[in-house]
Every structure is written in structure tokens, then in C-alpha cells.
Amino acid sequence: ILASVGVVAYNGYTTSAQRSAAASNHNSVVKWIQNEYQKCSIGEKTAMNANLTCVDDADLPADAAAVAAATIKSQQATTAKMNNPYTKTAAVQNTGTAVPTICSTTNRGQIVITTDSDNVVVTTCQAAKDGDTTNLLSDTIALN
């Protein structure tokens, strides 16, 4: 009996830890984009591990698509070390991955980076419950 209670408690712990890790990954990517983009505004020539070429300050904002592409490339590098807590694969998805509108067991832990005008949008499904929108995180980073 104690063994079955332990298994249930362990499964609850790991599910909670995975959800927290997915949310932490999401927040880290959002902050990283904001911080790296600021390098361009203080005169750096490149940002995002040299995947983004900064434009002159007068030309800011940079092309949102370029920022999104640089983010994806940087976060998928072998040195990035940010993995999906559910699948242990790269958390940040390739360009063209559909933005999740609901969470499912196939998109949990995935970070999708897209653009909307002069904005970069980061969307993550932090938990696995199918058809759930309450576990969906989305942040819009204004580049202007």
C-alpha cells in the first residue's frame, strides 16, 4: 500500500516539476530576447550569439522576423542546453511550427517563436492536459 502511495506522490511531483520547468524555460527565453535586443540599442554590432546583426539605432526596431530567426538559431545551438522538460529535446521549435492555441500531449513544453508586425511572440504550452488553454503562456515583446 505504501508503495502505491509513493508512486502517486512521485508522479505528482514530476508533473509539477515539468510544468514549472516549462514555465521557467518560457520566461528565460522572453527575458533573453529582451536583454539581447537591448545590446543593439547600446551600440553593439551583433547580439544573440552573433546570430543577429544590429542595425543603426536610428533604424530600430530591427526586423522582427530577423530577431525571431536569430532567437531560434541561438536557442537550438548545441550549447544552448535548454530542453523540453517532457521530451528532453530542444525546447525552442523550428521556424514554421504552428502556434499552439490549446495544450496537448504533443506540444507540451514546446516554445514557439513567431512575429506579429514589429513584435516577437513567445508561446509555450506548460502542461499536458489536452484541450486546455489555461496552461498556455504567451508573451509579446515589442521591438519599438
Please state what every model-predicted region is.
Residues 20-44:
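Extended, polar beta-sheet/loop recognition surfaces of beta-rich domains
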Residues 35-144:
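Periplasmic/extracellular, small/polar-rich flexible segments of pilin-like filament-forming proteins
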Residues 1-28:
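Amphipathic alpha-helical segments typified by the pilin-like N-terminal helix
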Residues 6-9, 33, 82:
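A general marker of short, structured functional hotspots
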